[in-house]
Amino acid sequence: WQHKEVLLTAWDILNMEFLSIKNSNDYRDSKQKSSIGELINLYRGYENAQKDLEYLKDGSLNEVFRTILGMTAEQFQYQNFECFFERFNRNYYILVAAEEFEHRGCLDASAAVNNVFGYSIQDYLSVMLMVYWLCSKCPEPLSAPENIYKKIDTTVFTKENITNFVKHYSCSYSDLRDSSLGKQLLYSKPFIKTDRGSKYIASSLLVVFMLIGNGLYWIVRDYYQKKGTQEFPNKFGLLFEDYIKDLASMYCKQNEWQVIEQGVEKGADFLFDFGNMRLLIEAKSALLKLDVKQQVPNLHSANQFFERNIEESYKQLKRSFEEFSRKGDSPIAKIILLYDEFSNTSIIEHSLFEVFQGDKNCFVMTIRQFEMLLYLHKNDTAKFEVILEKIINCMTSASSKTNIDALYSELNINDNPHLKGEMDYFQK
């Protein structure tokens, strides 16, 4: 026997659980004990035997990068837990706290939470954090006696509320076996209900933690999707545009930005004019599907995302670019602004090579990067001007094109002060 160290990633744990449930059951009385090393060896052997290495053999360069995009999108979640606090703050502000938004009444987050759990959003968040704390003590949160978390009679921390929360975010063995999402179902349903004993076990403390960033958004989305309409994506898109207006009002002068009036053919959403350069913004609120954010991504879903969001955005930006390039001499950057978050927007740009390599004026930017940019515009003018200058150089230089991530990294811009202080609802 040779003892060697093997790599086990956080997403491997979910896959091991999924494969165990998919290919076996827990009805037998006998229990086979194995060491962690033996389990990992069994998993690696099975994974290698089942791995389809042919699915990219005839794939295009775009599909290769879209595969990398899906793989890194899953990995990114485990490498940057701060993003979940930021995501919570952003979602909470857009869905709940920003009372002055023009389209505030489009989506009712309070009704969505009350419909599912029967209590307020604040109570929902409190129960979520309590369940996470219970899971940090024991992977079976419902085994905890009520007196551990219920200290007064008026508290929301009751056995019933804790149980209902865990059950709502649970999946059975049959759910996992039958779902087209496979292992990915555990990101939205991180508790597993066992066949034997009907116990509820946290698949991973990390994916329970991820509910902090995603839970409220998913509750509201699912509430409206059950009505069988496109109400949520359409109306959340309007709220996303309201959020961009809010950012502009917060950090820019009134004459530095405008909402672009739409004609027969839809163009870009916003124009920002900073004097030495202009930014055309087309905002897209759609998220990359869960079946793409994994180590073997669903390329059909990935292709749909690019067709409906990236390619369509580019067409809209081109229409507006033709109009505004005739109105002024300062250079114009076309910005596809995404609500979703990615570890590196360069991968998105390489995933539609024919567009981004053929147009050095077009960039992908996440909402986090945009928040940071406008914050610097008001609070660190010198650094903001350096960013604009580097974007202009990128657009006009004969050398290969760079991307927003690389520009920020070069300037050591990592922190996002916008979602701190008054915008930090997690600490309130």
Name every feature range the model reports, one short phrase each.
Residues 265-268, 287-290, 341-346:
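Flexible loop/turn segments at secondary-structure boundaries
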Residues 1-238, 242, 246-250, 254-255, ...:
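Acidic, metal-dependent phosphodiester-chemistry machinery of nucleic-acid enzymes
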Residues 261, 283, 293-294, 347:
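A generic "cationic amphipathic patch" detector
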Residues 238, 242, 264, 311-314, ...:
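Conserved structured core elements
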Residues 260-263, 337-341:
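Short His-Asn-centered micro-motif
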Residues 285-337:
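Catalytic cores of nucleic-acid endonucleases
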Residues 249-273:
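A short acidic/basic microdomain associated with nuclease active sites
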Residues 248, 270-272, 277-285:
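Conserved catalytic cores of phosphodiester-cleaving nucleases, focusing on short active-site segments
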